[in-house]
């Protein structure tokens, strides 16, 4: 049974940022991720010669701390500026993309981190002043502290399955957090799209909310677009999937002026936080006798890539101070 200072459940951006900062602070750590890859919504897909960003399409940098990291990434070639202005833009500032794709950001941060993939946390249990976590593969890990960076409903599921009782005010904060869902279609086109430069379009009042041209973006050699839908979870759950896909594709073709030759899909159940917590992280064991238990992610004071990064950054400092 492995023993570490901090177990991090979830290897999205918040998780890997926190992991690296804790490792730099000389803490022993272990990250676990139920998926087959790290990065969460910093995701990409390749098929039939096309390359797609499937989740987050770009990011901005406004916090000075984050700007310093982005500057280093630009210098090292990990990210590039995609664009800063476009017709009808309400503000002019750089929008960055990963190079070659968004997932490289998480991979770059996670280079030295111990990460177990395809490992789902089932229960956490208190063992005196420490935690014992049980996993779907029958492994167990002992840790002084736990950080959960999954979407909050998944974190709550782990906590409830474990019969861990939180302070009522903390639980109320967590229960308030909600997410919107998104159906993503990655489509190969029969010719280059007519989406205006720089290769993205945001759409209101349609079944489609966003289209990115991955060829114009510079990540796909052949014409390929990523389509994000305007759907809530119940609309998706109750729909005939093939009919839904065709409706989304037909709508997107009106904007791309090109026909879809082939496509693949992905449903983002927790695409973007609708209701967020006001703080960068949640100290879930506060006002209890529980060992250190923290939650972080893009639902904490910032629903974007930058928010996820800063949440992981600051929660790592809080955990380090807690364990000192």
Describe the role of every protein-language-model region.
Residues 4-31, 316-320:
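N-terminal Rossmann-like FAD-binding beta1-loop-alpha1 element of flavoenzymes
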Residues 246-247, 251-291:
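Flavin (FAD/FMN) cofactor-binding core of flavoprotein oxidoreductases
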Residues 186-237, 247, 252-255:
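Active-site substrate-recognition segment that forms the wall
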Residues 23-47:
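Glycine-rich FAD pyrophosphate-binding loop
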Residues 117-131:
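A conserved short coil-to-beta-strand element within the FAD-binding core of flavoproteins
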Residues 7-9, 32, 141-155:
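Short hydrophobic core segments
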Residues 39, 145-198, 258:
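Central helical "cap/lid" subdomain
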Residues 58-64, 87-108, 238-244:
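Short beta-strand to alpha-helix junction loop
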């Amino acid at each position: 049974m492995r023993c570490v200072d901090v177990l991090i459940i979830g290897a999205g951006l918040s998780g890997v940022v926190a992991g690296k900062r804790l490792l730099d602070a000389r803490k022993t750590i272990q990250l676990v991720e139920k998926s087959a890859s790290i990065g969460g919504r910093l995701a990409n897909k390749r098929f039939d010669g096309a390359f797609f960003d499937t989740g987050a399409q770009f990011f901005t940098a406004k916090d000075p701390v984050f700007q310093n990291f982005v500057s280093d990434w630009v210098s090292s070639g990990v990210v590039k500026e995609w664009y800063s202005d476009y017709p009808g833009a309400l503000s002019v500032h750089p929008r960055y993309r990963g190079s070659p794709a968004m997932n490289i950001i998480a991979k770059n941060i996670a280079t030295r981190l111990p990460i177990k993939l395809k490992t789902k946390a089932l229960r956490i249990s208190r063992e005196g002043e420490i935690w014992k976590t049980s996993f779907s593969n029958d492994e167990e890990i002992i840790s002084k502290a736990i950080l959960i960076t999954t979407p909050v409903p998944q974190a709550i599921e782990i906590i409830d399955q474990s019969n861990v009782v939180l302070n009522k005010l903390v639980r109320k904060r967590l229960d308030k957090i909600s997410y919107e869902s998104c159906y993503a279609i990655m489509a190969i086109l029969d010719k280059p799209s007519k989406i205006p430069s720089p290769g993205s379009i945001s759409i209101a009042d349609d079944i489609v909310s966003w289209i990115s041209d991955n060829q114009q973006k510079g990540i796909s050699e052949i014409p390929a677009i990523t389509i994000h839908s305007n759907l809530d979870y119940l609309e998706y759950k109750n729909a005939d999937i093939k009919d839904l896909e065709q409706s989304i594709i037909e709508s997107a073709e009106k904007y791309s002026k090109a026909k879809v030759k082939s496509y693949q899909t992905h449903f983002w159940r927790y695409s973007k936080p609708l209701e967020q917590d006001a703080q960068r992280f949640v100290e879930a064991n506060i006002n209890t006798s529980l060992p250190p238990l923290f939650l972080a992610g893009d639902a904490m004071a910032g629903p974007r890539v930058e928010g996820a990064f800063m949440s992981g950054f600051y929660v790592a400092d809080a955990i380090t101070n807690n364990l000192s």
